[in-house]
Amino acid sequence: MRRQQSYRFEDNESTSYALRMNRRFSRVESGADLKDYFDRGDIASRENRWNFEVAWEVANKVGGIYTVIRSKAYVSTEEMGEQLCMMGPYKEHCARTEMEEMEFPRGNPLLDAVNSLRSRGYKIHTGRWLVDGNPQLILFDIGSAAWKLDQFKSEMWEKCHIGIPHLDIETNDAIILGFMIAEFLEEFRNFAVTYSQNNELSAPRIVAHFHEWQAGVGLIVLRTRLVEIATVFTTHATLLGRYLCAGNTDFYNNLDKFAVDEEAGKRQIYHRYCLERGATHLAHVFTTVSEITGYEAEHLLKRKPDIITPNGLNVKKFSAIHEFQNLHAVAKEKINEFVRGHFYGHIDFDLDKTLYFFIAGRYEFGNKGADIFIEALARLNAMLKHEKPDTTVVAFLIFPTKTNNFNVDSLRGHAVIKQLRDTINNVQQAVGKRMFDTCLQGNIPNADDLLQKDDLVKIKRCMFAMQRDSMPPVTTHNVADDWNDPVLSSIRRCHLFNSRHDRVKMVFHPEFLTSTNPLFGIDYEEFVRGCHLGVFPSYYEPWGYTPAECTVMGIPSVTTNLSGFGCFMEEHISDPKSYGIYIVDRRYIGLENSVQQLSSFMMEFSRLNRRQRIIQRNRTERLSDLLDWRTLGIYYRQARVKALQAVYPDYVDELSLYGSKNNLIFSRPHSEPPSPTSSRHTTPAPSVHGSDDEDSVDEETELKELGIK
């Protein structure tokens, strides 16, 4: 059992805020917002300032960093325009759909640098990324430089004493990509200097931003070759941290005790660890995505981050403004259809009094908190039986794992329900025709004449087909190695078998949700909108996009103070629970207390009536601005400015005089009753007293708009 304890991060930096009151919440802003810099690169062009962003996931959908880079592309392009270029490996299967190939215009140092590398035999693809913003792209074909791998490794050994195993293909590819990018940037700088001199421009100022250790090789090469380029390195999760947590170690209690070299060596990743640590220490500016990851990096990589760069979202993509409540109702009805089919023969609960909870992500049973989620559901089941027997919770676990096929019982249920619906529709049409004909003749319809024996026989056949002796399955697929599967083993241990007496029903869906799925028929985004609560009690989560996506879609969620998202919300919202963000303490209390707290949160949510849930969803959706890249992108700009000033001391960014944190702070809604914590001096943005009727007017209006009395 993991003891759950971590450490708070002290920040004595005094930050001044301009208080701006709003009738829904208090908003405290630091001096600048990224929107202030949206000029499509006009200022950057005049300053001859260039920004290169390097990641393995650029136009290459292979992980969470792809979401970060892709969603940030729009605001990055709005800020930097043609002075921005993104770089990564060329993967043909992804590039076909992600990239529009085209050459850079003549007289552009980018084109000159590309042609210079092509003359050396390197294959380079240029164009634009087919995402919002359409940033410029340079993708490097790793295979075209594989013949120089031994030379690259030799230089890495001579200058850094890092040896790369011959059989580690992933690291070999990272070495090739890193050297290709470093050579390109070196050539680009030379051409940019010449171009500036010929056109009487100021000297070029170049920033290269590298994400994760695979891209960090390029940073190491630039610094060891003494190329005058400002560098930023961002780690989204430390390499060693992932391995340690995957092994169920008591991670946060032992961060300062790990012998990092020994631990990396035992896991045969010492060379990768050295590359990550080398990039961390050689970068002019080092950033992490959250303070808790920063603390992890401080102990495992031995450098404290200079700036925290939280992950944002392109909120415009999820934005539904006044429609999100209606979208919830539409999506919920589609989930209702699944529930009718999956639980056929056992639908003894009212779907209007049924709540849908879900957990989703990579199948990391302990790291994602699935262990305590299932345990807390067992306790919730007991509490609901005692306190609210008319309320049912259906808990979905969406974790992709190896399966053999769909569960036959689940498929049969959907076929039976479809047959019943078709039969009822046919009978309904026949009854309607008979009623019309009877009325047309001037007679009052008789119930016995309307519903005939043939109709009753058809209905009875369908009802007999719906009878089942077994309980509804807990999984929609036949899971390979199901006797060892951690989710199924935990469900068995907690006796959550979907019996008639259980008020918590379990559905394990071991596959990503898509609109072509024959069971659900909806994609993940629509599924989230249809649920009532997302539960993500993670033990190791450097950021956590799943609860963030719930928030911008107006769906309340449970997170923890060991996730980057949870820490961020704790820091920026004085009473997160009022806004539908429930934060489980996995730092300072033991596992048993964390499970109890999670079950209490879920029970508290289950007690809410429909009106209260609608009001809470409205409050949750109001946090969207806090998670938008237009808000959080300012931290990336701050990191670039700091790197530029390290390499070019004369560089001054007049507009960058803003605080380093707390871009937005939300206080308690005025309609929420005060609590003792709101008076503590440590609580951010204490609530300002307002009229008690202030939110009630909004609630009535919201309900009226939705047609709910």
From Swiss-Prot:
Residues bearing the modification Phosphoserine: S26, S30, S660, S667, S671, S675, S679, S687, S691, S696
EC number, UniProt record: 2.4.1.11
Keywords on record: Cytoplasmic vesicle, Glycogen biosynthesis, Glycosyltransferase, Phosphoprotein, Transferase
Compartments, as annotated in UniProt: Cytoplasmic vesicle, Autophagosome
Pfam families for the chain: Glycogen_syn (PF05693)
Effect caused by changing W629A: Abolishes interaction with Atg8a
Function: Transfers the glycosyl residue from UDPG to the non-reducing end of alpha-1,4-glucan. In larval skeletal muscle, isoform B is required for the formation of autophagosomes during starvation and during cloroquine-induced vacuolar myopathy.
Protein's name in the database: Glycogen [starch] synthase
Lineage: Eukaryota, Metazoa, Ecdysozoa, Arthropoda, Hexapoda
